[in-house]
Each structure stands twice: as C-alpha cells, then as structure tokens.
A protein has these predicted regions:
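Long, hydrophobic alpha-helical segments that serve as membrane-spanning/inserting helices
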Residues: 1-39, 46-49, 69-70, 123, ...
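A short, terminal or domain-edge coil/loop segment
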Residues: 442-450, 498, 599-603, 630-637
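A transmembrane helix-and-boundary motif of multi-pass membrane transporters/channels
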Residues: 1-218, 347-576
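A cross-kingdom feature marking solvent-exposed beta-strand/loop segments within repeated
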Residues: 226-246, 406-407, 431, 568-583
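Secondary-structure capping and boundary motifs in well-ordered enzyme cores
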Residues: 86, 247, 419, 423, ...
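Structured cytosolic domains appended to multi-pass membrane proteins
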Residues: 568-613, 617
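Extended, well-ordered alpha-helical segments in internal regulatory regions
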Residues: 254-262, 531-538, 588-605
C-alpha cells in the first residue's frame, strides 16, 4: 500500500510539473536524436578513418537542430529542419577558411553571432537557422577545422540533421489526439491537486500551495488552448475547436470558483452532506478512466446534492458550483472517449498581417548590436584568461541574450549560468573521480545529463548550465583531456562572459526591466477592461454571440507576460520594491480568477434565452458597477506607472448592492457577475493599498 501511494504521488508529480508530457517528449526527442547521431557518426568516422572530433560536430548539430526548431506546425518544423544544413555548412566553411587568420576568424565569429541574432526577426525559423549557424561556427573553431575537412564536416552535419529528422517524423511525429488526451488528463490531475489543497486538513490550509496549484491549473488550460491553435479538434475529437475551448474553460473556471468558495468556508463547521456528496462525485469525474456506471452515479449524486442545496448559505453555493464542475468534466470525458481513431493534419491558417509600425530600430537589431559588443569584449577578456579556452566567454556572452531582453532578465540569466557552472564543475569533478576512465559509464552519464538538461531547462536555466557542464566533464574524460584546471577555466570564462553581457545590456540599447513590466501590465489592464465590458454586456443581453473564451485566454497570456517580466523585480535588492512587485503579481493573479468568473457568467448568459434578460433598471445598475470596476482597474494602472490615482467617490460594494435591489434576481448569470465584479474590485483595491 505504501509503495502504491508513492507511485501515485510520483505519477501525480510528473503530471503536475509537466502537463501533457510536453517537456518529457521534447527532452526524449533531443536525447534520442543525439544518441542516433553519435551511433551513426562513430560508424561513419570509423569507416572513413576520420578523427572522432568529426562525430562531435555532427552530434552537436543534431542536438541543436532538435532544440532550436520550434515552429508551431509539424510541416513547418520539417521544412525548417531541412533548411538547417545551409547555415551549418556555410558557417563551418567560413570558420575553416578564416581559422588561419587569427583576428579575422574572431571578426568572422562576431559577424556570425550578429547575424544569428538579427535573423530572429523572421520568427522561429530565423531563430533556428541562426542558432545552428552559431553552434556550427563555434564547434568548427573548437575542433580546429581545416578547409580540407569541409566536405567530410558537411557530411557529418547531414548525418546529424538526418538523425533529428528521423526522430521528428518517425519516432515522435505530431500526434494531435495523443497530445490532447494527455493534456486533458493533466487538467483533471491538476484539478485534483487543487481540491486536495482546499479540502484536506482544513484547519491548516497552505495559501501558497493553493495559489501555486491554481496557477498550474491556468497554465494547463492555456496549453490546451495552444493545442487548439495548432490543430482542428473536429478532425481528432467529436467536437469543434470552439466547443472544446468552451468545455475546457467551463471545467477550469468551475474548479477555480469551487476552490475559492471552499477556502472561505469556516474551517470549524461541518460540511453539509450535500456538499460532501458533490465533492465525492467531482473526485470521481476527475479520475483518469472511470467506468460509465461510475460517471452516471457521479452525475446523479451531484445533481441530487445541487437540488437540495440552500443557495442562501455559502455551503449551498459551493455545492451547486461543484455540480457545475461535475457537468463540465463529464462533458470532457464524453468528448475524449468518443475521440476519432485517426486524424489528418490540417493546413495551418495563414497569419494575419498586422499594420503595427514600430519606431526606431527593430528589437532584433538592437539585440544583435548588444551581442556584437558583448562578444567582442568577451573575446578580448577570454583570451587574456586563456588563449585556448576564450570561446567559453564568448559562448556565455551570446547565450545570456537568448530568449530575454531586459536588464533584469539578463542579470538573472547570468546569475543562473554562473551558479550552474560552479555546481556543474563540482559535480563533474566528483563524477570523474568516481567513474574514472570507464567509457560505457561515461557515455551513460553523458546521455542522462543531456536528457536532464533539456527536461529541466524550463524549470530553471541553471539546471541546463549545470548538466551541460557535467556533460563537458564527461566529454573531456572520454577524449582523455579531463583536468580540474580546464573546468576551473570554464568558471572564470563564464564569469567574464557574463560580466560583459551585463555591461552590454546596461549600456548598449538598454531596455529597462521596470519599463517593460509597466508596458506588459498596461496591456493586461487593457485586456481586463475588455473582458469586464464584454462579460457584463453578455449578461445584460443574453442569448447573443460572444467571444469571451478567446478574450479570456488572451487575458491569461497577457498575465503570463506580466509574471515573466516581473520575476527580476521580485528578486531585486531593494526590499520594498521586491515585496511590492510580489504583492502586485499575486494580486493580479487572484483578480484574474475573478475575471474568469465574470467571463463564465457571460458565456452562460450567451447560452440562455434572450427572454431571460434582467430588467432595464438592473442592466443600467450593472453597467454602472462595471464602469466603476473599470475605474478601479485604471487606478491600479496609474499606480503601476508611478502616478497618483484618485479614490472613488462611491464604494463599488454600494453600487453592486444597488444592482441586487433593483429587482428580485434569481440565481444565474447576473448574480454570478455581481459576485465576480465584487471580488475583482476588492482584490484590486487591496493591491492599491498594499503595493
């Protein structure tokens, strides 16, 4: 029993930390591409009597081509992969020709780095082509490639990319049905963890755990929305994409609302039998493979509990919300169990061109100039530290700009890289001592570290650096060149490269962290206002069409950008500023769940009969209350920008009370909208008072 519980806990951890197994799939694909490339290239070098360094280049290209290609659709990913030999062979050729001319080769390297960043303006394909060109030039210098070796190096590149293409199209092809089933299973798994956080040991609730699990629930919902952007649900499941989006939205929001209601129940009071029955029924629906009999019993039990619920009591409201969650997850069970057996990949819709014009230099050009300056300085510093290992400083100066743009993000990235390098050196020395000259064991550790590096890279960049450093230690051991002094040089070169990267970020086309944070926050507040307006209009005019689900997902994506750009501010040296950023982000995350509830009220109203519209007086009062909440949003927006905001003349609570007194309002979208507006306003008001 104990081992079974441990297995269940481990399985739940994997599902929670990697919804849909996307990280597992990506890391496994990269590792398998590397292994296939190494096997093929070792055979190739043995047959052609070439040094093992030739195999190293092909293996690195295979790994990089697996990691760097991130086009949204499978067809685009294959096309990008097929294009990769062009920049790879071109970069190797340039490096081999320029290598005899010391400083000219350095200038060529910096030119390649500049171009690799500049082409990011062309989206994922440009980024992939640039990264592969950079890595190819780098390793051509590393192995001291000569012009005579260009044909054999080109062949090694072809073998490496062929290995990646084989894995991408044959071992891990695009499987829309399997992917969405994993994501839906993850949605259920995360929903159970949310329930556990608010139902088990009620007297010792862990608020941090509840927030973390609710955030994970929202992230899983966005992952399903991303799947819907890439695939047509009608070709894989028994519903259209719009219908699945609504079902998932219902399931997510109902669990969020239920968690909030259960959290606010008095921990000293016993729950009513109806609420307990509804929670048990919901747990049954959240199991992976319940039988049809179990699902029917869960529906019947939850419906009976909702019929008996006293809506004037908080426990009664929670019971009804639990029943709605049961209905939502039952619908998803029906959709996934009736999924079609096969699916054809739909052609991606062409991107809609935008007319937005940006002033000044393109961000990719600014970043390219920053990288050129940083890598030029890193070349000089790196050669002063070690004429043979200078490229590590250049590598660090380049990589700290990958995927980030603000000063704070780059500073954080440098910190992660230095910490990961130091820890990796320590681990590499320890493993080298324990393993010794044992090629099979060294190869196993090397492959394991590659998998861990790319499985954990999205958790923290330090993990990638840590495992890559261990890989280098194993690689030097295999080549017979391992020494502690070499790894110590890596630390020094990493620090030097990180330092010039930070200097370049602060003094060359600097992008302020706070300014970027304010920009992202303003975008979020604008989208929040749109959701408030659209939700209230749908409630006061039921039975119409609404795009609230898509608008809410856009709101969630905007919030993710706020959280991402706010992370450096939450780790700053100033205690007051750090805590203010933390409270603001937490407040926006809490308020976002109230916006979800309002959007759900609007979606439910859109399904209702137009005759169920509230009286005109109620509609007018609700619109006024919504305008008042929008004013509160505007006040928070001013506060974030450092401006002063005027206090409202009339409390929002009083205006919402006027809505309820205009007529006898039965349970339904209007009440749900009033409750959501009240919670949203209260949360945002608390943000302004505490930040």
């Amino acid at each position: 029993m104990h081992s079974s519980a441990l297995r269940d806990r481990a399985a739940r951890f994997v599902v929670d930390s990697d919804p849909g197994r996307l990280r597992l799939r990506s890391a496994a694909g990269t590792t398998l591409s590397l292994v296939l490339a190494i096997i093929a290239l070792l055979a190739f070098t043995r047959f052609t009597h070439q040094p093992v360094t030739i195999a190293m280049l092909g293996a690195i290209v295979a790994m990089q081509s697996s990691v760097a290609v991130k086009d949204k659709h499978q067809r685009d990913r294959v096309i990008t992969t097929l294009l990769l030999p062009l920049p790879a062979v071109g970069a190797v050729t340039l490096a081999a020709i320029l290598a005899p001319f010391d400083w000219v080769a350095d200038v060529g390297f910096i030119a390649v780095l500049f171009t690799a960043v500049w082409v990011r303006r062309f989206g994922p394909r440009g980024n992939a082509l640039g990264m592969v060109a950079f890595m190819s030039y780098f390793f051509a210098l590393f192995i001291h490639a000569t012009p005579a070796q260009i044909p054999i190096l080109a062949a090694a590149i072809g073998v490496g990319i062929a290995a990646t293409l084989t894995v991408r199209t044959m071992v891990f092809p695009d499987r829309p049905r399997a992917e969405v089933l994993h994501l839906v299973r993850a949605l259920r798994g995360v929903s159970i963890t949310v329930l556990d956080a608010v139902t088990k040991d009620r007297k010792k609730h862990d608020l941090v755990a509840v927030r973390r699990r609710l955030d994970r629930l929202g992230e899983t919902g966005l992952m399903i929305d991303d799947w819907l952007d890439r695939h047509d649900a009608a070709q894989t499941l028994s519903v259209t994409s719009d219908e699945l989006a609504v079902r998932v939205f219902d399931a997510q929001i109902s669990v969020e609302q239920l968690a909030g209601l259960l959290w606010n129940l008095d921990s000293g009071d016993e729950w009513t039998g109806g609420l307990v029955d509804a929670i048990i029924a919901l747990r049954m629906c959240l199991q992976d493979k319940p039988s049809e009999e179990e699902l029917r019993a869960a529906r019947k039990s939850a419906a009976a509990a909702a019929d008996r619920a006293e809506m004037s009591a908080p426990g009664g409201v929670a019971t009804v919300v639990a029943y709605r969650a049961v209905q939502a997850h039952l619908a998803i069970h029906h959709i996934t169990t009736n999924a079609l057996g096969t699916a054809t990949t739909s052609e991606p819709e062409p991107a809609t061109p935008t007319d937005e014009a940006t002033s000044g230099l393109d961000p990719s050009t600014k970043a390219a100039v920053q990288v050129a300056v940083a890598t030029s300085a890193a070349t000089i510093l790196g050669e002063l530290i070690s004429p043979d290992r200078w490229y590590w400083a250049v590598l660090t100066a380049f990589l700290v700009f990958t995927g980030v743009s603000t000063r704070g993000e780059i500073l954080t990235r440098v910190g992660h890289r230095i910490v990961g390098t130091i820890a990796g050196v320590a681990a590499g020395v320890l493993l080298a001592t324990l393993i010794g000259q044992n090629p099979p064991a060294q190869i196993i550790v090397l492959v394991f570290c590659v998998f861990c590096a790319f499985y954990l890279v999205t958790v923290a960049y330090a993990w990638l650096t840590f495992f890559v450093t261990v890989v280098l230690a194993m690689l030097y051991g295999l080549l017979g060149n391992f020494s502690v002094q070499v790894l110590e040089l890596r630390i020094a070169e990493t620090v030097a490269g990180g330092a010039v990267g930070i200097a370049s970020a602060y003094f060359v086309f600097t992008t302020g962290t706070r300014a970027t944070f304010i920009e992202k926050a303003n975008d979020y507040f604008d989208r929040l206002t749109e959701v408030i307006d659209a939700g209230v209009e749908s409630v006061v005019a039921p039975g119409g069409e609404t795009d609230l689900v898509a608008e809410t997902r856009s709101l969630d994506n905007a919030l993710q950008e706020v959280v991402k750009t706010g992370k450096p501010l939450q780790m700053g040296p100033a205690v007051r500023s750090r805590r203010g950023a933390q409270r603001l982000v937490r407040g926006l995350q809490a308020g976002n769940r109230s916006a979800h509830a309002l959007a759900r009220a609007g979606v439910n109203a859109a399904r209702a009969d137009p005759e169920s519209a509230p009286p005109e007086a109620t509609a007018v009062a609700l619109r006024k209350a919504a305008d008042h909440v929008c004013d509160t949003v505007a006040g928070v927006k001013k506060m974030v920008a450092g401006e002063s905001a005027n206090a409202p003349e009339k409390p929002t609570t009083a205006m919402l009370l006027e809505v309820m007194t205009t007529s006898e309002i039965p349970p339904g979208p209007v009440r749900a909208a009033v409750r959501a507006l009240n919670n949203l306003d209260r949360t945002l008001t608390e943000v302004t008072s505490r930040v």
